[in-house]
Amino acid sequence: MAENTDADLAGRRIEIAAALFGAWSGGDLDGPRRYFAEDGVLYDIIGGEHRGWPAIRAYFEHGRQRYPDLVLEPTGDFWSRPDGLAMLWTMSATQAKDDLGPELVGRRWTVEGMSYLIFDGLTVVREADYHDAGSRERSLRGG
């Protein structure tokens, strides 16, 4: 039996993080659930804290309704520590509402962000997402 090293665990967690972000980008609202503890926490710097899978799913559903073609894509930059990892990603979607001006409806925006994931073994118990509230509009306006 092979010994589970810190590097092995970090590698497996990176695979889980990539799969989790793939699930956030998918159409199945319960897709991310398999990576999260039932009592896990999702914190978003803009959207606040959501405790437990039902609250996380409701927040995710709201985001998917607003941006049906949302894509969260890890850049490949990961940093690990014994209880988790941090990662960079891009988020993109098509602007569907005119809250930033009717001239921007139908345009695709792309923003950068960073997350850290805390694990219990290979299960995410906390995800914290950081991104700039003004970056979506800057992307749409070419700034």
Question: Which role fits each region the language model picked out?
Answer:
Residues M1-E38, G143:
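Short, low-complexity N-terminal intrinsically disordered segments enriched in polar/charged residues
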Residues L29-D83:
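A solvent-exposed, acidic/Ser-Thr-rich amphipathic alpha-helical stretch
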Residues P82-Q95:
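A short hydrophobic beta-strand element
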Residues A86, T110-R138:
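Short beta-strand edge/turn micro-motifs at domain boundaries
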Residues S92-D120:
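Exposed beta-sheet edge and beta->alpha loop/turn motif
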Residues K97-D99, R136-R141:
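A short, polar/proline- and glycine-enriched secondary-structure boundary/capping micro-motif
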